[in-house]
């Protein structure tokens, strides 16, 4: 409604018309209201609303829709009545008390119907404003909008709205309201197809806009895509052409990361990038799309480099803040606990991105080497080295403070392990100094180290191929943790891990060390191996895979060098049954190597050579081998 400096003298005259008995008077009064009543003058608007009443407004709207009758109306006035009705309803809804009333809430289905039939009409913007204001004013309003299939109407119109328009802005705000009130799981069960369309439209806004609405789009995309309930939607989105919405999100992420924006928005961009990589894989970071859109094709590595650089910065900042909260800030306060929890969640996102980039770097040379040149690889390795150095400093700080338990520490070990699996010589001295500590780290739900060892196994397997690596492992003080890890992987405890290769990595690591025991001067009491021998016996009894049995027998043969039958039987919970199982395993593998030429000859030689060295200390094995 247009403001006017001479409102007061005209208001009383307007109210008299609105209270008149004839529709002509009320119509004239409403027209006057649109001329002089200020939209922010809530007091006057309340008086006007009370004077005209909701019944007449409802009848006016229905007449404009062709469903009702105004006594003075003519058919050719329907558009005028509709425009007037929507205008005054939109204006009245600016008063929260009016907007939250049931009389306004019941108009939502009618306004949605107007939108569906008047998509190009001048009243459309006021329809959107009415819906937003009434939905904001009360929960009943928001639920009526949702239950009246408001999302379906939004989805049908958003793709035709002008980029960055006020209608797009209102649509985004409406969707934010809905997501705060209704779970994404419920929404996607009812409106999966519509939600897919909406995400694609919002992704375009995120790409092309350069104002505050860009960040509203970013937040909305994160609210949808980073939700744990978004699995159905993610599946549906992957059926859409990636050249459109996925590319738009990449463009938007790059724009945020390479411009001067608030740190919080950069973090939001990283969260969105992590969601996209979870959907499309690491290649999303380097996928180059030719497009006729206003966005020029960018170098394939730009998004990758920007995401890694910002992740490195976030990790450095967040780990510094986490260290302060853990070791210096006042403890046992709600504010410290909340800040710590939030920053730890953010670190998880940055860690996840770096770990995915490490995976990409390890695969890209083989699969898409032409997309990343030598200069890009150099930049990536430099940034990864800097990132790993920062994480190692965080672990060193934790070690100095006597901290070994925590999911943040375990996540740090995981990312170190991921990188060292590809570059085992990176940060060599620091890794050597911290190896024992990293092997001792426990997650918050662990009673003893396990996952930290699993994360480091690829690196351990590589470094123990050389004597120096074996010495580093033997001297770090946590060799028992590696032995226990294999025991838990193959024993009756039934530990499970994502990567089944952990078993063979652990086997190879232990074999590498035992084979070099003389050069390493490894002196261990046989009791150290008792649990592992029991696990090897259990493994051999529960597998038909000959390669697994050969591996188990080889490790057993190497362990037997350190002990004897008598010493083992003196160990707690180590009995004749376990020893008999191990003897049967060795006997079977010796027989297999004689009969099967395809048997791994290296392992066969380890078993037979071991047997010749220690058979005299294990008298009962001769019964199994039948010598």
In which residue ranges do the predicted regions lie?
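Elongated alpha-helical scaffolds that mediate protein-protein interactions in large eukaryotic proteins
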Residues: 1-128, 132-156, 160-199, 206-219, ...
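Well-ordered alpha-helical segments within folded domains of soluble proteins
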Residues: 85-87, 127, 347-354, 412-414, ...
């Amino acid at each position: 409604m247009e403001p006017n400096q001479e409102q007061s003298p005209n208001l009383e005259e307007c109210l008299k018309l609105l209270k008149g008995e004839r529709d002509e008077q009320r119509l004239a009064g409403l027209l006057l209201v649109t001329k002089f009543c200020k939209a922010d003058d809530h007091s006057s608007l309340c008086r006007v609303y009370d004077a005209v009443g909701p019944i007449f407004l409802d009848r006016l709207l229905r007449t404009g829709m062709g469903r009702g009758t105004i006594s003075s109306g003519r058919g050719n006035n329907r558009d005028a009545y509709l425009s007037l009705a929507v205008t005054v309803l939109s204006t009245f809804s600016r008063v929260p008390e009016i907007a939250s009333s049931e009389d306004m809430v019941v108009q939502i289905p009618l306004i949605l119907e107007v939108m569906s039939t008047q998509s190009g009409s001048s009243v459309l913007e006021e329809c959107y404003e009415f819906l937003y204001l009434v939905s904001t004013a009360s929960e009943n309003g928001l639920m009526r909008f949702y239950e009246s299939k408001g999302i379906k109407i939004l989805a049908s119109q958003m793709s035709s709205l002008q980029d960055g328009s006020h209608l797009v802005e209102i649509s985004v705000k409406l969707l934010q309201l809905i997501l705060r009130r209704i779970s994404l799981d419920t929404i996607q069960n009812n409106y999966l197809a519509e939600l897919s369309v909406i995400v694609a439209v919002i992704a375009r806004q995120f790409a092309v806009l350069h104002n505050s609405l860009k960040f509203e789009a970013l937040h909305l995309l994160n609210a949808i895509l980073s939700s744990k309930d978004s699995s159905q939607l993610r599946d549906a989105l992957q059926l859409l052409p990636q050249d459109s919405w996925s590319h738009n999100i990449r463009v938007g992420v790059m724009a945020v990361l390479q411009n001067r924006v608030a740190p919080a928005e950069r973090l939001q961009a990283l969260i969105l990038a992590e969601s996209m990589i979870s959907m499309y894989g690491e290649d999303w970071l380097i996928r180059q799309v030719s497009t006729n859109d206003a966005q020029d094709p960018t170098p394939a590595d730009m998004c990758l480099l920007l995401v890694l650089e910002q992740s490195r910065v976030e990790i450095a900042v967040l780990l510094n803040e986490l260290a302060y909260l853990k070791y210096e800030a006042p403890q046992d306060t709600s504010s410290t606990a909340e800040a710590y929890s939030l920053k730890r969640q953010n670190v998880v996102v940055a860690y996840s991105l770096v770990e995915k980039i490490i995976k990409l770097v390890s695969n890209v040379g083989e699969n898409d080497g032409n997309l990343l040149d030598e200069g890009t690889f150099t930049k990536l390795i430099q940034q990864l080295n800097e990132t790993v150095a920062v994480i190692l400093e965080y672990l060193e700080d934790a070690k100095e403070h006597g901290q070994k338990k925590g999911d943040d520490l375990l996540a740090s070990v995981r990312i170190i392990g991921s990188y060292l699996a590809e570059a085992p010589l990176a940060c060599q001295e620091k890794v050597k100094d911290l190896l024992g500590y990293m092997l001792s780290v426990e997650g918050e739900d662990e009673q003893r180290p396990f996952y930290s060892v699993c994360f480091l196994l690829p690196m351990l397997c590589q470094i123990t191929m050389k004597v120096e690596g074996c010495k580093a492992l033997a001297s770090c003080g946590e060799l028992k943790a590696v032995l226990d890890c294999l025991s838990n992987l193959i024993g009756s405890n039934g530990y499970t891990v994502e990567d089944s290769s952990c078993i063979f990595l652990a086997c190879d690591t232990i074999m590498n060390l035992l084979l070099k025991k003389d050069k390493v001067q490894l002196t261990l009491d046989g009791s150290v191996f008792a649990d592992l021998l029991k696990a090897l016996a259990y493994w051999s009894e529960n597998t038909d895979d000959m390669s697994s049995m050969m591996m188990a027998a080889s490790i057993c043969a190497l362990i037997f060098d350190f002990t004897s039958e008598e010493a083992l039987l003196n160990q707690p919970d180590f009995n004749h049954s376990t020893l008999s199982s191990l003897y049967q395993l060795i006997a079977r593998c010796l027989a297999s190597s004689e009969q099967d030429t395809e048997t791994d000859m290296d392992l066969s030689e380890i078993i037979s050579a071991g047997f010749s060295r220690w058979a005299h200390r294990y008298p009962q094995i001769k019964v199994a081998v039948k010598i």
